[in-house]
Every structure is written in structure tokens, then in C-alpha cells.
Amino acid sequence: MGDHHNLTGLPGTSIPPQFNYSQPGTSTGGPLYGGKPSHGLEDIPDVEEYERNLLGAGAGFNLLNVGNMANEFKPIITLDTKPPRDANKSLAFNGGLKLITPKTEVPDEHTPMMSPVNTTTKILQRSGIKMEIPPYLDPDSQDDDPEDGVNYPDPDLFDTKNTNMTEYDLDVLKLGKPAVDEARKKIEVPDASAPPNKIVEYLMYYRTLKESELIQLNAYRTKRNRLSLNLVKNNIDREFDQKACESLVKKLKDKKNDLQNLIDVVLSKGTKYTGCITIPRTLDGRLQVHGRKGFPHVVYGKLWRFNEMTKNETRHVDHCKHAFEMKSDMVCVNPYHYEIVIGTMIVGQRDHDNRDMPPPHQRYHTPGRQDPVDDMSRFIPPASIRPPPMNMHTRPQPMPQQLPSVGATFAHPLPHQAPHNPGVSHPYSIAPQTHYPLNMNPIPQMPQMPQMPPPLHQGYGMNGPSCSSENNNPFHQNHHYNDISHPNHYSYDCGPNLYGFPTPYPDFHHPFNQQPHQPPQLSQNHTSQQGSHQPGHQGQVPNDPPISRPVLQPSTVTLDVFRRYCRQTFGNRFFEGESEQSGAIIRSSNKFIEEFDSPICGVTVVRPRMTDGEVLENIMPEDAPYHDICKFILRLTSESVTFSGEGPEVSDLNEKWGTIVYYEKNLQIGEKKCSRGNFHVDGGFICSENRYSLGLEPNPIREPVAFKVRKAIVDGIRFSYKKDGSVWLQNRMKYPVFVTSGYLDEQSGGLKKDKVHKVYGCASIKTFGFNVSKQIIRDALLSKQMATMYLQGKLTPMNYIYEKKTQEELRREATRTTDSLAKYCCVRVSFCKGFGEAYPERPSIHDCPVWIELKINIAYDFMDSICQYITNCFEPLGMEDFAKLGINVSDD
């Protein structure tokens, strides 16, 4: 027994040969190489000897400072295959020694199971020197300088300012999309009756990571280890969140409903409607937790929703009954009952929040599912609760030097007029300076308004003789004198002769005057009688009937007439290079029909649409659909367009002309600037200045259908920026792409909005034209300003049209947002998968697995220039004007 059981560590036994650990994968602890193994226990390694070596008693492993911490051990750097046995030969690295942890490897049946043949140490070979890297903090993050010949991409770092991520989201990034269920099973979802520590553990798992933690995550993401997502638990912010969470759960232990609401709202991230979660209000309104004070709704908003949040930038939603600003005994701490407000932009809007205001115009916003915030008319109360319009109104004027005598007839209103209070101004007028009643306005003489026969389209024009200068006298309107004694008195320096426009209609009375008009007597005698009429003096009311409009009173004008009015009001700054001739479309073929559309208030546009079954080939008429690119079209039907393949010359300027944003459904993955004339978007892995390779964009929660689409992209598409400012798209795939843009909506004809164009492989199409898009943007913004001036009680050339419109239409036009015009500045492309009416499962492009959006800088710059011009030269709607319109814009 003693011959076969030679165990080391027992008294009187011989010491076997030492193990050599410098050659991973081999062991000399068993029988000799080539020798026949015996049936005894000679091949069992001496575990006790190995443990003594670890403690520094033997010579197998040489530990220099056993008392140091594990991450302070020095590595072993040697020139041969054996570790140094002298402590003085070890070199310092990272300020400490190295602890080698054995790892079991079984290459064959002869190798002992307990043989320590490998370690977790990283061994690098450089210039004949073998260096072992210690596993401190992060085992894969030490080699910031990659090995020779290995090109590692730069790490993907988090945006520490704008990233809202929870610990659960971090686990999803670690495990990937297939293991989402495993991440959910990591912590079981409790209910209100669960132990408090389980609830706190669950709530902390879904807390929002702070900026310091994201910075710490970025610090561990080196070039070698780009996917390191190790979260340090001993963080100061995490300790504070832990205490705040424990304090809230303790306060809600007797309110099971509120506690359950808290669990539900954290799990659903606000998608599920929940009520208020209330805690008692303190004396100073602040909450003290872990030695720090803060407002309760801010503390818990930062805990579960926002990365950064302050009290002055928050407001509560309408359905919150115990908001912090209400000063009630209970304070709601539901993080999804508060929003962050930056100017008029609201972060974190939801469907059930009815107070969302339209966001400001942004060039590089993150589009998602569009909410109906472009129309502020839904904030306007119904007509039943609005103040009635007044028949008389005053306008702020400088004090006249001499006031004429006022007759007794003007001292009291006429029977058909409403009583007038001299001290009350019109409800829609601008803030008053000095007001005078209308019956005290000076009447020095009769001004003569200039005359212009309105060159209107036949379908919208007025029939009847033009009125004489006396008929244009505004003092004869509705049996009372108007205060417009000098038409050019109110003008701006920015526009040439702002109110010196020729008027197609004489009665420029106040827009809110609702006095009925009598039909005119279209005869020469009646015209001569009106022309020979002289107004009364010394306050006498003339007995002649009031001047009225022709029988056919148009409610709209053509686009050409509206643009002429805009030139007279705003100048020619934004109309350079355009002719003033009529833009009316004259039908030259019976192969297409005309449809009437009103894109802006009071203006009618004729849109041609191809008749079903008709075909246009070779030479395209200029009034056909796609008239902007008719010279590049070979064949046109109601279902398809065939381009010739030609186009304008590509721009050779090396400047950033656009931005491409890449999405997978509603999730934005990445973006890249376009700086060359031809810019490619493909599915490869090439980094280039004129190429955006989608294969380089990671997404840990990518869906299987997105994998299939990305695999089919291959050569992708090409955007060509032309010298005339247009953008063309060429499909270089064998699968189709689906394109939509505001420019294509305008060119395709008909009244269908957001029309989807299917572009087959090797085909091209013009997706953006600057000349057409800038006209649409300019007309919409100038129409908005016209409606705003009308609501402010100012004179515009469109007053006679706006009088026929409802207040709802005018307010909708005056509150139009620039975001509603953003579709004329961008192009959206979906790869392989279609959307729209033909695809019920994907009604919007946001439902497509892989799509991109091209934002064109020149269009946004033009929109910005118009907005800045209007802001600097004209008085916008103020807070009082919005209040008079019934729109609540007051601060909470």
C-alpha cells in the first residue's frame, strides 16, 4: 500500500516533482510521458502541495506580498517559459502584484481532473516577451493600445446628457434581444402585498441611470472591450436613489392602491394610465432623504423617468389632482404626471395629456409617431362661450391737435348699431395706448382709395363694374364712420408701402363687423349716383344707402392673386426670380382632370390628376402632373411614372447639404451628415465620407424582420444633390424602396396626402425640388402672418376674403406651426417594405422595420429666414392675443 500510495503531505513521504504552470494545457503532475500508468493513485496531483505553493511556502508559485489586495498584485514578466522564483526579478505593473487563479482543463482521459493547467490571465507576446495582464476591475479593458495588425473600431459610448436608461435596459443590452425574458425573470414583479424589500429591489431595477453612472460605463468601454456594460453599484447617486425609494415605499405601505399604481407605472413606463400617487406635504414643501433636500416630484421624477430634471422646468398634466403647484395637503409624486417644459416644447408627451403645446421648429429633431399638435385650433373654446363680436371698434391713434365739433346725431348710436362704450376697446385689438370713440374721429376730408380691377380667375372672379373713388370711401360703410382716415399711416419699415395696396373691394371695415350688406344695383345710374354723392358735414349722417359688394362675392382667390397681395404686403424679398403672371393652369389635354384644393386659408389651387386608363408619352404638357420634371418623363399614367434617366448636373461643392437619420420602426439608430454631391446608403461595413453603411449600426433589440431587410439592402440607394438644389434618388438594389415627401405630394396631383411612391431596382426619381418647396413654405408662412394680422385688427389685402371665413378657420391658419411644413424639407425612404393604404399592417412609415429620413438643409434655412423676417418686422401674437382667442398659454 505504501508503494502505491505516495501522498505528499504525510509524514515520511517523499516530495514528488514540482508542477510547471508556465505551459498552459499540459501537466507533469501525472505519470511520466510515455510511461504506462499504474493502477494505483500515482496520477492524482498533490493538492495540498499546490495549496502550500499558493500560500508562498513552496517554489511552484512565487507570491511576494501576500497581505496586499488582489488588485494590487504585480504581473509576471519573463523571457522563458518558467515564472521567476526570485521576488526581486518581478517588475511592477499597475502598482501591485498578480494573483493567478487556476482553471481546470481536461484535454484527455490521462489528465487529472484537478490539474491546474490554465489561468484566467491574458498572455500577450510582444518582441519575445511574454506578459500576463492582471484581471483588475474589468478583465478585458486593459489593452487600450491594440496589438499590431489589429484594427479595433472606436467604442460606442453613451450620450451622458440625453440617455434615459434603466438597469433593466442595461441588462437587455448585455443579454441581447433573445434574452429579454431572462432579464425580466431576474427580478420578479411584486404586488402591493409583497415585502417592502422585494418592492424596493424591483423599483431600483427600473430606476433611471444618472449621468455619473453613464460616465463610469463609458470609462470601461475601451477599444478592445467595446461592449463592457459593468455597472458599479457603490455609486453616490445610487445610494441616494435607494434611500429615496425606501422612504417612498415606507410612506405608501398603508396605501395599497397608490403602491400598486407605483409598481404599474414603473413597469409600463407611463403607457398605462394611472392615478395620483400621493404623499403628505412637508412644511417647506421639500423632501429630505439621505442628507439631501429636494422637491418630491423632482426627486422621484429623476428616479424613474428623467435623467435630469429641475422644478422650474416642470409642469403637471391636466388630470393630476394633487400636483405640487396646487399647494394641497397631499403631493403627487407620479413621475408621469409631470412634464419637462423648455419654452413651448414639452419633453415626454403622451396621448392622454391634452395640454401638449406644439414643439418649436427644429431641424434635427427625433421624429416618432406624430401627435396632433400642429393644429392649435383644438384649444379654442366653442362659439357658445366666446365673446360676441362688437360692431364698433377703436384703434390706437395719436391725439389729434384739433377735434371737430360733434353733432348730436353722433352722440348716440343709431338704432341698428350696438351700444358703444368709449372706454372699452375691441376685444381683438392690440394693447391700447390712447383710445377715442369712433364718433370723435377727425374727418378733415374724403380720402380717395386707389382703384384696381381685380384680375381674378374666371371661376373665382367678381362680375360687375369697378367702383369709383367715391365709392371706395371707407367712411360710408355701414352708416358709421371708420377710423381709417390715412390708409398708409400704419406701416412698417421692413415692407415697401405695407398698406398702400390697391383694393379690389372698397369696404375695408373692421373684420369682425357683422353688419349685413345689401346687393348692389348694377346699373349706370346707380353708379353715377354713388359717384356724385358727397358726405355730410358737421356730424350729419348721409341718407344714401350703404355701398355694398357685387352679387358674386368670392370666398377664395387664386394662388397668383394671393402672391401678388404678399408682394404688396411683405415686399419682393422672397419672390426673386419669379414672374408675376397668372399661375392658373389651363387644360391642354383631356387625359387628366382638375381637382380644387385649398392648402391655405382663402386660396384655391388647381391640381391636375391623370384620368384612369389614360397615357401620356414622349412630350409632356406643362400643366400635367409632375410638371416640374415633365422634361425628364417618358411615360405617365395614373399608376406609374417612367423617367428617362437624365437629370441636372450633380453639385461639385464639398459642403454639408443634408442629414440622414436611420430608424428601425420608431427607434432612431444613428445619423450621418451628407457632404458630397452623390451620397450612398448601403448595407455594408464601409466607413467613408460619401457613404452611410447601415451594417455598422448596432441595435441589441433588433427584430428578425429587420435582420432580413438589412441583409437585402446590399448596394442600397444613392442620393444626388444637383446644382439647382434638387435631390434625386436612385435605387441600386434588386428590391424596391418606398419613398414619400412633400414635394412628391405636390407634384403627383390630386388631393391625396403622403402618397407613397414605389421605386423599383435601377430606377431613379426626383424626390425634392427647392424651387417648388420654397414656394409652398413661403406661401404657408405668409398666409399665417396675414391671418394673424387680421385677428389683430390690422388691414390686409385679404380682409375681404377673411370676412367670409369662420373664426375657426382663421385661428387654425394663424396658429399654423412650422413643423407642419417639415415634410417639404425632408424625404423618407423605406427599404423593401411598403406602407400606406396598400399595406394595412403598416399604415405609417414608423411601422417599417428599416427606413431613413433625409433632412435637406437648404429648405430648413429658407424656412428659418422667413420666420426670422416675420418675427423682426411684424408684431406676433402676444399672450393677451392668445388669451382673447381662447387659448390657454399661462404658466402653471
From Swiss-Prot:
Region (Disordered): 1-43, 135-161, 505-552
Effect of G716E: In mg132; suppresses the constitutive dauer arrest phenotype on a daf-7 mutant background
Low complexity composition bias: residue spans: 528-540
Keywords recorded for this protein, A-Z: Chromosome, Cytoplasm, DNA-binding, Metal-binding, Nucleus, Transcription, Transcription regulation, Zinc
A GO cellular-component term linked to this record: heteromeric SMAD protein complex
SMART domains: DWA, DWB
GO molecular function, one term: I-SMAD binding
Positions with biased composition (Polar residues): 15-26
Consequence recorded when altering P296L: In mg125; suppresses the constitutive dauer arrest phenotype on a daf-7 mutant background
InterPro entries documented for this protein: Dwarfin (IPR013790), MAD_homology1_Dwarfin-type (IPR003619), MAD_homology_MH1 (IPR013019), SMAD-like_dom_sf (IPR017855), SMAD_dom_Dwarfin-type (IPR001132), SMAD_FHA_dom_sf (IPR008984), SMAD_MH1_sf (IPR036578)
GO biological process: anatomical structure morphogenesis; BMP signaling pathway; cell differentiation; cellular response to pheromone; dauer larval development; defense response to Gram-negative bacterium; determination of adult lifespan; negative regulation of transcription by RNA polymerase II
Domain MH1, chain residue ranges per copy: 198-347
Signal peptide coordinates: none
Subunit structure: Interacts with R-SMADs daf-8 and daf-14. Interacts with daf-14 in a daf-8 dependent manner. May interact with daf-5.
Homology family: Belongs to the dwarfin/SMAD family.
PANTHER family assigned to the protein according to its UniProt record, in alphabetical order: SMAD, SMAD PROTEIN DAF-3
Official protein name in the record: Smad protein daf-3
Origin species: Caenorhabditis elegans
